[in-house]
Amino acid sequence: VRDLLFGVPSGLPPLADTEDPFADALALVGAQVTRVIVDIPAGVVGVLLELRQSTRLRGTTALLRVTGAVRQEWTGSASANRFTAWSITDAAVDRDLTAIRIALHCLPAGSLHLTGTAADFVLLSARPDRTPPSSTDPAALLRFGVVDESTVCDPLGAAHLRSSAPFPRH
């Protein structure tokens, strides 16, 4: 996953409109935000998504990558903790000539807002470590099987959006 934060390889199969969040942002509903990785000097924000609860996206995980990032804002519930699963209940993608704005609204009471000049969405088939963690580590047990930036993944397909490109057609 870490390599995809630096660049999405060309030649990946394009996603069908039903899986492309830039054609239909509601494709993200049901996915869970598991990690947000911010690289300030590079202007890159990566959002890892768990897909086991998604009804529209194949694969086990996905990476939503925003480049030329100028805004990354998370607003979350005060009652949330490290065990909270942030399930996407609504999403919006807005694009004009200078910026792409992505909003992910989650339960319980969380929102992620990203603004940048380009975005990529890559569906992945993850190969997480299958060695069960110690039963005395509840945090590790909870995250067992969930992808992080060091997990080996196989890309299944990608969608791309640029601020100066025509908006995808449905």
What residue spans do the PLM features occupy?
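Surface-exposed, interaction-prone regions used to assemble/regulate multi-protein complexes
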Residues: 1-170
